[in-house]
Amino acid sequence: MYQSLMTVRETQIAIKEVKTFFEDQLAKRLELFRVSAPLFVTKKSGLNDHLNGVERPIEFDMLHSGEELEIVHSLAKWKRFALHEYGYEAGEGLYTNMNAIRRDEELDATHSIYVDQWDWEKIVQKEWRTVDYLQKTVLTIYGIFKDLEDHLFEKYPFLGKYLPEEIVFVTSQELEDKYPELTPKDREHAIAKEHGAVFIIGIGDALRSGEKHDGRAADYDDWKLNGDILFWHPVLQSSFELSSMGIRVDSKSXDEQLTKTGEDFKREYDFHKGILEDVLPLTIGGGIGQSRMCMYFLRKAHIGEVQSSVWPDDLREACKKENIHLF
């Protein structure tokens, strides 16, 4: 039977410890400035993140003008637009405390309709748009995760230490070649269990089998230059995604990806015109789940143990039987 290592009160204190340490180090090591973020954007701007392309945003109209607005899914596009508007230069970046609602999320131990993450974005030069630069950035972020685990171990030694010294890089195609008989999700479990920490490169495009490792919107990540950070979760005994990130599309890759997904209508949106006409800066960015981070480092079995959300009665009952106490 699962037993949380902390009381609810102790957990709340530790959550602040996790978030404060990580935010401070993320800003310092990636040279990011914190900015205020929107909870909603106009529909016509095209700034909302449409994730895998099928999730429905929450829509409402504004009394004053009748304009249609959308609650954000993430700030993947907004951040790039903001870097342009605020006059940032190559090597400079921003981050924000992003809160979102994803109404179509399938609820389970690691997914909630409420999303909280550190959303960050940084301007890059054309020659930086390489797998090597992507990997260097991943190593920087992984270094923060390692130091966070050490920091928490000093305060809460009973949490233990599980992260390996190094994170392993693997492409989604290499994973398919290694585990052709497994589903993409099971491949993630296998590789994360083997190494403890992995970064899967290249998500969104079709593999040689014709299947995708996972879906990605066509208009923010370059599918050849993106990926996910996965850890092996010691309590759940499964792979556990901490971050999705990548070098963003330039005019060439955006044009190709919009054509592949049959979304040519998006070319008329302000954001997409900015990419296709080389107005918006080239960037790298990502989202790092705050509740996911707390769930991993505080060794929790359910995301509802580290965030306040709404859960169906049957799910709450099931958790109660497993000795999992949701906020």
Swiss-Prot record:
Could you mention a single GO BP entry for this protein?
Answer: L-asparagine biosynthetic process
Residues of the signal peptide: none
One GO MF annotation is: transferase activity
Compartment(s) where it occurs, according to its Swiss-Prot or TrEMBL record: Cytoplasm
Q: What is its main location?
A: cytoplasm
Q: Which UniProt keywords apply?
A: Amino-acid biosynthesis, Asparagine biosynthesis, ATP-binding, Cytoplasm, Ligase, Nucleotide-binding
Catalytic activity line of the entry: L-aspartate + NH4(+) + ATP = L-asparagine + AMP + diphosphate + H(+)
The pathway where this protein functions is: Amino-acid biosynthesis; L-asparagine biosynthesis; L-asparagine from L-aspartate (ammonia route): step 1/1
Q: Name one GO cellular component term.
A: cytosol
Alphabetized Pfam families for the sequence: AsnA
List the EC numbers from the record.
6.3.1.1
Identify the NCBIfam families for this entry. Answer: asnA
Family per similarity comment: Belongs to the class-II aminoacyl-tRNA synthetase family. AsnA subfamily.
- The name under which this protein is listed is Aspartate--ammonia ligase
Q: Tell me the classification of the organism that encodes this protein.
A: Bacteria, Bacillati, Bacillota, Bacilli, Bacillales
> What gene name does this entry carry?
asnA
